[in-house]
Amino acid sequence: MKLSKRLDCIAAMIKKQASSDDQLADIGTDHGYLPCFLVKQNIISTAYACDVSEGPLSSSKETIQQMQLQDHVIPLLGDGLEPIIGKPVTMVSISGMGGFLMVDILKAHLAKLNQVHTLILQANICEYFVREYLCSNGWEIIDEAIVKDLHHLYEVIVFKRTDKNIEYTMLDYRYGPILRKDQPLLFKQKWQREVKIKKRILDSIQDHTHPKFQETQSDIREIEAILNDH
């Protein structure tokens, strides 16, 4: 099975953290490609392919049957994390949705899943919101990556439970503490692109005293300072 570059990056991040006895739930699994791949590659022992809609879950069941993984990949219908309450899940992956929706899913049931020690998350937008919520609620960022799939850039973030009192900054939430430190090429490309977009916004604002102009100008300076600090 060949995964998309986005899913392949997520799988690689999971592999770095998983042991053979870990059980993973993939939330919003769509076709079930990720959990099937992880089990097939012996990265994890058991996976739960979870989705809120019958259609995607039916596609997952087809993938599971085609790969003859019925004993190791279990499809579950339900909203967010609810289907895995009471299951021996130790890792959770959520990808392909916005950051606000992702946080809503985590807020609803994560507190009931004390055995979950690792989250592997890929938000399409608003990654800062995911970082801020989890880092303020007993989780730390232990790994980050950025991947290009077709014309889109995606950030993958790995969180672990922690008792440590780690002081993250707003810059950590916005840019990612590890990505900001390492600044891989795709990270630079993402934020250089953002600067171009914001400069076009500046050019469209005639009133330089307008709050939007001041805010956009401040954002540009911040991004350029981050990029020049490496």
Segment roles from a protein language model:
Residues M1-S19, C36, S58-K87:
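S-adenosyl-L-methionine
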Residues S20-D30:
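Conserved class I S-adenosyl-L-methionine
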Residues H31-I44:
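Conserved SAM-binding loop of SAM-dependent methyltransferases across substrates and taxa
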Residues P88-G96:
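Short SAM/SAH-binding signature in class I
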